[in-house]
Structures are given as C-alpha cells and as structure tokens.
UniProtKB/Swiss-Prot annotation:
Changing T201S: In HH25; no effect on protein abundance; no effect on function in cellular response to fibroblast growth factor stimulus. Secretory protein that plays a role in various cellular processes. Acts as a chemorepellent acting on gonadotropin-releasing hormone (GnRH) expressing neurons regulating their migration to the hypothalamus. Also promotes neuron migration, growth and survival as well as neurite outgrowth and is involved in the development of the olfactory system. May also act through the regulation of growth factors activity and downstream signaling. Also regulates extracellular matrix assembly and cell adhesiveness. Pfam families: NDNF, NDNF_C, NDNF_N. This is Protein NDNF. Keywords: Disease variant, Glycoprotein, Hypogonadotropic hypogonadism, Kallmann syndrome, Neurogenesis, Repeat, Secreted, Signal. O-glycosylated; contains heparan sulfate and chondroitin sulfate. Glycans are attached at N322. The keyword Secreted applies. One of its GO terms (biological process) is angiogenesis. Induction: Up-regulated by hypoxia (at protein level). It comes from Homo sapiens.
Length: 568
C-alpha cells in the first residue's frame, strides 16, 4: 500500500522520478514526509500498517485514500468508532491509464487529475453503519485507488483507522480466545469477581499484553477508544489529533472541513475562543472506571453499591502496538444490603441508638392503647441525623435533627410507626429517642436555641473566670464542671468531648464547680452568670454546663475553653 499523493506525483513527473522512495513504516521518515503540505493538500492518506486517529464533525464527511499497486494483494481495513456510531464505505477506483509514465505529450495539471480521480464513483466493496469495530478483509485485492468515506450523523466524534497489506504478519490487534466471554464468578453486596480466558497473543505469539477492566452503570463498551472518549469527555478541540502525527497539517488547519466551503458555511476559526469551546463542549459528569491490571485474568471489583446494576468490560492491549481488542462484556446486579434489624420502642422509655457513618437504623413503635397523638423526643448526641417517620407506610415526617427536638404527630387507632434514622457522611451518630402517647410526661429537659457558653474576657483574673449561659421558662437544674487542659488544646480534641449525651455522672467529683436551679418566664432575662474561682494563673480550662430534666436525663451545653491571666 502506498500513499495517494506519491501516486499522483507520478502523473506529473517524468519516468526517472519513479526512483523516489515511497513512504514506509519508518516512523521518522514518515513524519518527515507528512510535514510537506504540497504532498498532502486537501486530502488524507492512510499509511500501511499504522493506526491513525482522527476526528469527525457531525454531518461533515471525511475521505481517505490509499493505493494498492499490484493485483492479488492481501488487504485488511479496520475502522473503530469511539464515542458515536459511524457510517463508512470502502470503494475501489482504477488508476488513470497514463500512471505508468509511458505516454507522450503534455500531462494535465495535477489538481485537474486529482479531481478526475476523486469525482469518479468507483466500485463499492464494503459499507457499514453502527458503533462496532468492523473489518474489511480480502486475501486477494486488485490494484487500484481505494477510497474510504466516513460520516457521523449523531454528533462530533473521534475514530481510528488501520489498514495493512500484510495482515498475516502484522497482527497488531491482540487475539481473543475461542470463548471471549467475561464471566462473573462471585457476587456480593459491594464486590464482583470477574474471570476470562487468556489471550493467545501472550501464550502463543509471546507478545506482551495487559488487560484493562472497565466498570460503569450505563452500558457495555465495544472498544477501548470509546471508553477513553467517555473518560476524557472534554473540549473536543483539545482532544483532536495533532498535525504531523495523525493527519496532514492542512487537515489540522481546516479540521476536517472541505476546502471549498470551510470558511463560508461554518465560519470556523483555527483557534476557537475558550468561551465558545466551553459552551459547545461542557465537561459531563463521568461515572466510569478503568483499571489496567497487567496480565492477570481474574479480578475483583470492590467498593460497589448494593443492589445496583453494573456493566463490566475487559480489553486486552498489545503493549508494543498499544492497540486493543474487546472481550464480550457482561453485567451483574450486586446483592441487596442485609435487612436491618428493627428495634422495638416502648412507650415512655428512652432507647439509645448508634448509627454507623452513612448507615441507617430502623425502629418500630406500636402503642398498646388507642391514642390521639404520638410524641417523639430525639436527642442527637453528636452531629445531625436524619429522621423519617411513617405511619402504616405513609410518610409523616422527614427532616434533620440536631441537639434535642420533639415532634408531635396525629395518632390513629391500632397504628404502627416505623422510624428510620440515617447517619451523615462525617462520622458515626449517637442519639437517644423516646416515643410516647403521653406527651405531658417530659423526660428531656427543654433547651434554649443557643446552647453556647459565653466567657467575659474583661472579668478574667489570675484565679477566676466569669461565664454566662441561657436558660428557659422551665425550671431545670444546671451543673457546671471544669477541667484543666493543655494550652494547645485544639478543635479536634474539643469535638471528641462534644457528646451531649454523656452526663455529669462520668465526671470526677473534683471537676464539679456547683449545681443550681434556674428559670425565667421572660426569655429575654433567662440568662445566668457564674464565676469559677480557685483557678491557677496562666492555665487553660475546659468548662461544661449540664442541664438535668425532671426525668433525670441530662444534656450538655457546648464546651468552652477559658484561660486565666498570667500576670495580675
């Protein structure tokens, strides 16, 4: 196979010029030849035995040429669509009779002879429409000019073309085993184990290969090119082939548009503005994973979601040629999450609940007697937790809970309530929950909207600190505790001590400052202050205030670190 433009030059130069060498598979020589615009003006050529990558604009056809000089030549042409289906056709045209240079007289101008060849229809040898990797293979092809036409009617897309006149010896694509299927050998809630038969390219041909596994939730892929296009879905101009590597400099300048109308119909600029590129080719959210694992033919995919369908593809890649072949992909649905054990709530009793990070817990409340109302008291000890309450399957409540909150819902005779508690992404959650049909029986103390402790900087001394906190209209017992901490006591340590469900019973007696009762009917005056004495100069102290309800349940205010003055 030789390049069209060299063939066309034979039409122009005398017979002696035929001693010029044709482009070969020598990469350095081929790159040097392809840089000359005069040889590659307004057409694309396919080299023998090298895969080319290129780009198609939607509804803008592209044409490639190559010449087979001798009859009975083996020929193989492979077209790989990437991110969109392609329509492509391979045709054969006879070369002009005077191509041998034996004729006498003046030759027609080069452009006119090119146009004469290109305008002829030729004989169609093969056509295909779809997104499969498709082949044209002939063990004995006639000599002539071969023309490959490609079109994408769906969207702008990448594609690859490989052609060779020595298909038996080349074999750049790895071979598949007699059974090319990917099997699912093990299935779990978050893992799937895959296995496939090894490629003969490694075992028989002794060529280096590696396997790449692709996981996604949408569909199976038919080529690694399609996977890479999906993974790198970005500005299409940046993804286009580079001049001198995959197509001629002229093609790069016009980017696939026909020369007679590229500037008129499309008003295309060689360097589009970043704004235009971002507008046309925005980056989509890609939910696909590609993992290359060497030459192993067993692989376990982990970190999957339960009860979710995934598609799995395996590609064998020839490391020498970087060309790949797809196994027959498969799909599988991971197993469902194990059903949660439901905790029974007893009327008027506090239940402690622990919820894992991103986990969930289910609780059931079935009042024995008929009731008009049901009250749920929730005390989230750490971070916020989401609560959902359903009555006989009907959703009544769904919201996040932080601190202490209560919800009163309308009751129904013989109704059953299902409570779902969902942890957050930050970490595990701990909470206390109480359900009752007698809401007058208050087990949790009421809290103000602001549970911070305020320290007065101007009232600090070398041995004391003055603080204040808010109360409510309900008369409650407040206890304040102190603990000496290091000067470098940080937010992480402070956060570990923020479990509001830990009561004063776990504190040392020496840390207790005092307890007192406090309330005010006027919420604007529901503020109390206290001076903690007996502190050491220049030391830091962690202060905690606990409010204790009538049922004995306590809630801790947000901790506060104060530091006494060093010099007084």
């Amino acid at each position: 196979m030789v390049l069209l433009h060299w063939c066309l030059l034979w039409l122009l130069f005398p017979l002696s010029s035929r001693t010029q060498k044709l482009p070969t598979r020598d990469e350095e020589l081929f790159q040097m030849q392809i840089r000359d615009k005069a040889f590659f003006h307004d057409s694309s050529v396919i080299p023998d035995g090298a895969e080319i990558s290129s780009y198609l604009f939607r509804d803008t056809p592209k044409r490639y040429f190559f010449v087979v000089e001798e009859d009975n030549t083996p020929l193989s042409v492979t077209v790989t669509p990437c991110d969109a289906p392609l329509e492509w056709k391979l045709s054969l045209q006879e070369l002009p009779e005077d191509r041998s240079g034996e004729g006498s007289g003046d030759l027609e101008p080069l452009e006119q002879q090119k146009q004469q060849i290109i305008n002829e229809e030729g004989t169609e040898l093969f056509s295909y429409k779809g997104n499969d990797v498709e082949y044209f293979i002939s063990s004995s092809s006639p000599s002539g000019l071969y023309q490959l036409d490609l079109l994408s009617t769906e969207k702008d897309t990448h594609f690859k073309v490989y052609a060779t006149t020595t298909p038996e010896s080349d074999q750049p694509y790895p071979e598949l085993p007699y059974d090319p299927r990917v099997d699912v050998t093990s299935l779990g809630r978050t893992t799937v184990t895959l296995a496939w038969k090894p490629s003969p390219t490694a075992s028989l041909l002794k060529q280096p290969i590696q396997y790449c596994v692709v996981i996604n939730k949408e569909h199976n892929f038919k080529s690694l090119c399609a996977v890479e296009a999906k993974l790198s879905a970005d500005d299409a101009f940046m993804m286009a082939p580079k001049p001198g590597l995959d197509f001629s400099p002229f093609d790069f300048a016009h980017f696939g548009f026909p020369s007679d109308n590229s500037g008129k119909e499309r008003s295309f600029q060689a360097k589009p503005s970043p704004k235009l590129g971002r507008h046309v080719y925005s980056r989509p959210k890609v939910d696909i994973q590609k993992i290359c694992i060497g030459n192993k033919n067993i692989f376990t995919v982990s970190d999957l979601k339960p009860d979710t369908q995934y598609y799995f593809d395996v590609f064998v890649v020839n490391i020498n040629s970087n060309m790949s072949t797809a196994y027959v992909g498969t799909f599988a649905r991971t197993k469902e999450e194990a059903k949660q054990k439901t905790v029974e709530l007893k009327d008027g009793k506090i239940t402690d609940v622990f919820v894992k990070r991103k986990g969930a817990k289910f609780l059931r409340f079935a009042p024995v007697s008929s009731h008009q109302k049901v009250t749920f008291f929730i005390h989230s000890c750490l971070d916020a937790v989401q609560i959902q309450v359903r009555r006989d399957g009907k959703l009544l409540l769904s919201q996040n809970v932080e601190g202490i909150q209560q919800f009163q819902l309308r009751g129904k005779p013989k109704a059953k309530y299902l409570v779902r508690l969902k942890g957050n992404k930050k970490g595990a959650s701990m909470l206390k929950i109480l359900a009752t049909t007698r809401p007058t029986k208050q087990s949790f103390p009421s809290l103000p909207e602001d549970t911070r402790i305020k320290a007065f900087d101007k009232l600090r001394t070398c041995s004391s600190a003055t603080v204040a906190w808010l109360g409510t209209q309900e008369r409650n017992k407040f206890c304040i505790y102190k603990k000496e901490v290091d000067d470098n006591y940080n937010e992480d340590q402070k956060k570990r001590e923020q479990n509001q469900c830990l009561g004063p019973d776990i504190r040392k007696k020496s840390e207790k400052v005092l307890c007192k009762y406090f309330h005010s009917q006027n919420l604007q005056k529901a503020v109390t202050t206290e001076t903690i004495k007996g502190l050491q100069p220049g030391k830091s102290y962690l202060l905690d205030v606990y409010v204790i309800g009538h049922g004995g349940h306590s809630v801790k205010y947000q901790s506060k670190v104060v530091k006494t003055r060093k010099f007084c």
